[in-house]
Amino acid sequence: MPSVQRLVAAGLLLAVTVVGCSAPSSQSSGDKGQSTRKVPDKPSKPVSLEILDVAGNLQLTQGMIDEFQKTHPEIVSKVSYSKAPAPELAGKIKAQQQAGRVQIDMVLTGTDGLAAGLEQDLWADMSTHQDAIGNPDYLPPAAEMAKLAQGKGTAVVYYPSGPLFEYDPAKVPNPPKSPQQLLDWAKAHPKRFQYADPANSGPGRTWLMGLPYLLGDKDPSDPEKGWDKTWAYLKELDKYVDVYASGTSETMKNLATGQVDMIMSTTGWYINPRALGTVPKKMKAGHFDDMTWVTDAQYAVVPNGVSADKMSAVLNLLHWMLTPEQQAKAYDDGYFYPGPAVKDVPLSMAPAKSQQVVKEYGVPEFDTWIDQFPKKPSLSSQAQVKAFDLWNRQVAGQ
């Protein structure tokens, strides 16, 4: 039976459990009057912003933020950044709100931290400030992901994600075209295929959420009652997997060193590690026939209790970040390929370095695949946590 680290899954599950068990408190979300009191077009004086990243998002957006501060010192005098694991986010924000001292002005988060804050009503209502943010001309799949924020967050980057697989062509001359072919290959080559704990891996999570579409399960949105084929498949595949990696980087290392020959991947995870030299350039990416992309996005949220002046600065910043010129920076080094959440941001608008990385380490067919196959948003975070728990008990723990 494969071993697996369940730390992140446990943390996410605990966060949701705490949410469900917490008694209501009049101070649980700090000053909720933010959405109703007047926010000026610009701060009364330049403000410093404290930005917390729990999603690795700064790799994509810090250039946008830093340029805004340099261009608009009359709005933002200084930006300070910090990072934390997503499972710690809700507790950190709630503690500041209950103390009446909100020190974090904006959070960059994935769906996990977004949902934990929604459950505890930690995030300010951004829908009342839509005129200040503008109306981003989102790509349709990004618009669907934006809805997960329920008006209390702003999608700032997007990518179709996967599921894709990555392999050594010298060891896998005939890559699989279906999950069944992958299972057959794994059976013939035990311990040579690997994916990471879905709770702590984008490729692992996308593989888990993409299988119900590939296998024709009853309800891809319901891991508990609608994934019979997926759970049966993963239990069978489990027989031929040696160890479930604790995170995606571990699978990349194992592929690079020849410990395994095929792993699950995404567009960004295929491009970026090869560009960084941690995975040999010779590795190839593949997709399954008739796949469905399971999309992903990252968000900016503002804690309740932030001052009107700081909210004004954040709104100006978000308006800036969602312009096509700034969105082009999201191509980065392929980390979230493509990256932009809004329409009409071709690679030709990206910085020269980004264009070179994608040209040298990307896959020309990626754009074809993105256009060719349907796209569905990720599960809600609550449903993801249920899926992680079921995977731990029914697959990794069997």
Labelled PLM ranges:
Residues 21-32:
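Bacterial lipoprotein signal-peptidase II cleavage site
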Residues 37-115:
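Early extracytoplasmic/lumenal segment of secretory-pathway proteins
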Residues 54-63, 86-87, 103, 108-250:
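Extracytoplasmic ligand-binding site segments that recognize negatively charged/polar headgroups
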Residues 114-116, 262-281:
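A ligand-binding cleft/hinge motif common to bilobed small-molecule-binding domains
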Residues 164-171, 212-214, 296-310, 329-330:
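A bilobed periplasmic-binding-protein/Venus flytrap-type ligand-binding module shared by bacterial periplasmic
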Residues 300-371:
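Mature extracytoplasmic/periplasmic domains
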Residues 364-398:
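Conserved C-terminal helix/tail region of periplasmic/extracytoplasmic solute-binding proteins
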